[in-house]
Amino acid sequence: MAEFPEKKDNLVIENIQPSVDANRFAIKREPGDTVKITADIFRHSHEKYDAAILYKLRSEKRFRKAPMHFVDNDMWAGEFTVNSIGYYDYKVIAWTIDPKDTPTESPLMELRVDPVYARTGTWYEMWPKSQGKDPKKSATFKDCEARLDYIADMGFDTIYLVPIHPIGVTNRKGANNALHAKTDKNGNPLEPGCPYAVGNKFGGHFAVDPELGTLKDFEHFAKAARAKGLRLALDIALNCSPDHPYAKKHPEWFYHEPDGTIKFAENPPKKYEDIYPFDYYNKNFKALWKEIRDIILFWADKGIEIFRIDNPHTKPFPFWEWLIREIKEVRPELVFLAEAFTRPKMMHRLAKEGFDMSYTYFAWREQKWEFEQYFKELTQTNAKEYMRGILFPTTPDIFPKYLANQGPAQFRQRYFLAGTLSSLTGMYNGYELCENIPSPVKEELLDSEKYQYKVHDWDSPVNIRD
């Protein structure tokens, strides 16, 4: 039997825009933005009515009111300006002049206001171990500090650091991704390994690699960077080498083979024998999730404002929604970048779940029609409400064929495109030197610093920094 209505609503409020998946996810803005809202509002008779937007920062007690006006065909529009970062709640309300009528309200909707540097920034990707002058040993944070003026003078406002933690010894990779690093006669590795294999006897995600220096050295570097107007981003690789303290202390946090051994990582077609992936739904998963939250907050306290997350598409969506909200509710100034070169719908979902920025397919776009099609998708569809794309011409994992063995003109052209197609752009260190020798077997640079110490000639005559 049909139920009688509990509320005598005489007005209909529907089709509120903008909206992300019928208000399942928040729309995103930055301080100073004007948020423009439209809604279809109508009723069954000719009685006059009015409408407004009620909005507030979630921490505020009272809603503020912004008027709406009739546009056409039952569409109403209004706007309000946001000046503080954090989560906002808003809704549309409509009412008639009849005092007996109860105002009609839409469901509460969510808006997230992120720092301006979530929308605009120029990044310089720094591999700390490659900032020195000796190809046989690691550079230090002091060497990195010596390069700050060079980076600031190029106009960058953000230094993005790859993982700075201790690197595993077991199954350590060698130069050019060789399965095993070279060792001395006692079996000690002679190569640094990959920084994404986090953890050894010196610690894990809360520690720094002793080759780079101490935690105090890092804090000094961070302070010096801030003094130069440079923000710091840190690469968070949620992987553990077999030598990571977690492997012994929390074996339940990992996947296991049928024989009980911890399972190595795979990201088909790639295999990573030097790292273990976390099992995000293990029997003690809440402790794991909280530990990862604490890693982020630890480095935020040390001066990191942006977190570039490695391979987020290989972790569960609910984890990201929980983690980013959990952190932003207490530290709304922190920003997250999704490093997910994967299927489009997967990338869009990560942005909806809360990532402030996303890597893009820019590196593989070459033809005019490809650029037009792709950037229309990012800027002229609903994606603009939740996805902010950052453009890197190259990365340590991607060296496109059109730059292979090419000269300064091609390198300038690609960076010019990156800098004009998005308000977020980045450069991998060495790009300004037009380093152009490709790997014969992969879409990467030969002799990648992912697996070896590397010395760059920052004063090379082909440097295009000017």
Model-identified regions with their sequence ranges:
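N-terminal structural segment of carbohydrate-active enzymes
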Residues: 2-15, 30-58, 62-230, 239-241
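Weak global preference for isoleucine
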Residues: 13-16, 27, 37, 41, ...
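Short, solvent-exposed loop/edge segments of extracellular or virion-exposed proteins
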Residues: 16-22
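Short beta-strand segments of immunoglobulin-like
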Residues: 23-29
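Hydrophobic alpha-helical segments with strong N-terminal bias
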Residues: 27, 109-112, 294, 378-379
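A cross-family glycoside hydrolase active-site/sugar-binding cleft signature
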Residues: 125-127, 160-162, 233-237, 310, ...
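Alpha-amylase-like alpha-glycosidases and glucanotransferases acting on alpha-linked glucans and related
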Residues: 195-202, 206-219, 223, 230, ...
